[in-house]
Amino acid sequence: MFDGIGFMELLLIGVLGLVVLGPERLPVAVRSISGWIRAMKKMANSVKDELEQELKIEQLHTDLKKAENQGLKNLAPELQDSIDQLKQAAESVNRPYQVEDAPSAKETPAKETATTETTSTENAKSDKPNG
């Protein structure tokens, strides 16, 4: 945590803090400073995680472009893995929409089939000669 500060430096800072702030305000100051340090570490870790995620997305995008250039044939295993990950992500995004659209999609083909059968029956009747 204190990479560049040795034990003697920490002791000196503690003694100076005790002299300047006094024994009553020193614990409060230490708590507030440790809270600030904790908040800064959280922000730094958050930024680091976001950057790693963006780099991963950029790598997947680059792999996808390479795969497109190769025509999706004879792909390297890491490129195929990236494509599989992207397909899974796309399926997970599209899945909620497919569940909502599924009942209307099932009803529509049945209606079209009935209409097609009626039309083909009428066409068959009109094709017969009246004679």
Curated annotation (Swiss-Prot):
GO terms for biological process: protein transport by the Tat complex. The Tat system comprises two distinct complexes: a TatABC complex, containing multiple copies of TatA, TatB and TatC subunits, and a separate TatA complex, containing only TatA subunits. Substrates initially bind to the TatABC complex, which probably triggers association of the separate TatA complex to form the active translocon. Residues 69-131 are annotated as: Disordered. NCBIfam families: tatB. Residues 105-123 have a biased composition (Low complexity). Its main location: membrane. The gene is tatB. Gene3D superfamilies: 1.20.5.3310. GO terms for cellular component: TAT protein transport complex. Belongs to the TatB family. Part of the twin-arginine translocation (Tat) system that transports large folded proteins containing a characteristic twin-arginine motif in their signal peptide across membranes. Together with TatC, TatB is part of a receptor directly interacting with Tat signal peptides. TatB may form an oligomeric binding site that transiently accommodates folded Tat precursor proteins before their translocation. The chain crosses the membrane at residues 2-22. Keywords: Cell inner membrane, Cell membrane, Membrane, Protein transport, Translocation, Transmembrane, Transmembrane helix, Transport. It comes from Shewanella piezotolerans (strain WP3 / JCM 13877). GO terms for molecular function: protein transmembrane transporter activity. It is a single-pass membrane protein. This is Sec-independent protein translocase protein TatB. It holds the Pfam family TatA_B_E. It is found in: Cell inner membrane.
